[in-house]
Amino acid sequence: KIMRKQNLGGNIVNIASKNGLVSGPNNVGYGTAKASQMHMSRLLAAELANDQIRVNTVNPDGVIIGSKIWKGDWAEGRAKAYGISIKELPEFYAKRNILNKIILPEDIANGVYAFLAILDKSTGNIINVDGGVPNAFVR
C-alpha cells in the first residue's frame, strides 16, 4: 500500500529457496512455505505492474557458511536426513550442484543486485543461486 501511495514505482525482491522448486526429505513445511512465497511473488508482480513496482525472487540453495539457520536444530535435522555429520554439510551441499560450489551470503546479494541494478525490465522472475541443481531448473 505504501509503495502504491508514494507513486514512485520500486522493487520487491523476495528471498525464497531452491526447496520451493524441488522436494527433499523431511522438508514439507519449509518447502511448502518457499513454494508459496515464490507464487506470491508472481501474483504480486502481476498485481503491481501497473504501479511500476517490480517483484522478483532469488532462490538460494543451502547457505551454510554465514547463515544463522544452521546454528539451531536445522543443521542437525538436515545432516540426519542425509545420513551425514554436521561438519560434512558444506561439502555435501556443494557436491549436489553441478558447479560443485558452496553458496555464500554474498552470492545471494549478487542475485538481488542483478534484479535491482541490471535487470530493470524484469518482474515475476526467479534467479536460482544454487550452483546449478538440475531438478530445480526453472521451467
Give a label for each model feature.
Residues K1, K5, A46-E47:
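Alpha-helical segment proximal to the catalytic Tyr-Lys
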Residues L8, A33, S41:
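Active-site helix of classical SDR
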Residues S17:
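Residue(s) in the substrate-gating loop at a strand-loop-helix junction
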Residues S23-G31, L43:
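Active-site loop-to-helix junction immediately N-terminal to the catalytic Tyr of the SDR YXXXK motif
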Residues S36, M40-L44, L48, V58:
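Hydrophobic alpha-helix immediately C-terminal to the catalytic Tyr-X-X-X-Lys motif of short-chain
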Residues V63-R96, V138-R139:
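A glycine/serine/threonine-rich, flexible loop-to-helix segment
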Residues L99-V129, P134:
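C-terminal substrate-recognition "lid" of short-chain dehydrogenase/reductases
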